[in-house]
Amino acid sequence: VDTRLLRTFTTLARTGGFTSAAAELHLAQSTVTVHIRTLEKELGTRLFDRLPTGTLLTESGRRLLEGAEEVLDAVARLRAGGREGDGAVRG
């Protein structure tokens, strides 16, 4: 799963709306929609209930949110660790 899709997913879950998620991510609203549809297709499940007032996580969405946040935190730690190192590749 593409981490960009996970970032869009977690932002939408937190903000509750496609417009606010798009603004926070500096993306077009249509891009947020495509990211969520792509993620739902890849996972084979609906992640949000779309309501007139915003979005609500489904049970599948709630389960994914926990794992997605962990993955994104791990990626951030790896990136931070890479910047702190001396740039040498060891093996």
Language-model segments: residues:
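Alpha-helical linker/hinge and terminal dimerization helices associated
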Residues: 42-43, 64-86
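Interdomain hinge and pocket-entrance segments immediately C-terminal to HTH DNA-binding domains
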Residues: 53, 82-91
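A short LG(V/I)-centered, amphipathic sequence patch enriched
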Residues: 40-57
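Conserved amphipathic alpha-helical core elements
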Residues: 9, 39-40
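The N-cap/first-turn positions of alpha helices
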Residues: 2-8, 29, 61, 68
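Alpha-helical residues within the helix-turn-helix
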Residues: 23-24, 41, 62
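Short helix-boundary/capping micro-motifs
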Residues: 12-26
